């Protein structure tokens, strides 16, 4: 399951992170919930946790702020694809 999560930082900058199976596995381990419960159980902390871990994975070993400090830089969280790809109409 892939879930795009767009983070808007206090600076106004936005970044979209894709929560993929590694992030979901960490979420399951951290929360004790299973992926089948995600729809009912996902809250703001969960979304930031998933985005943070996707961000960390994308940085591939480059140091990132600790989770708690990183959360303090966020002004908004947007779930899903805000700009879905346009599809061509059939002729």
Each language-model region and where it sits:
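Charged interaction scaffolds used for protein-protein
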Residues: 1-15, 25-45, 49-91
């Amino acid at each position: 399951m892939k879930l795009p999560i767009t983070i808007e930082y206090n600076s106004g900058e936005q970044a979209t992170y894709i929560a993929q199976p590694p992030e979901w596995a960490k979420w399951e381990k951290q929360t004790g919930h299973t992926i089948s419960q995600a729809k009912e159980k996902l809250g703001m902390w969960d979304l930031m946790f998933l985005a943070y871990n996707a961000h960390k994975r994308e940085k591939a070993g480059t140091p990132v702020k600790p989770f708690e400090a990183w959360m303090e830089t966020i002004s908004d969280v947007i779930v899903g694809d805000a700009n879905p790809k346009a599809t061509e109409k059939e002729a």
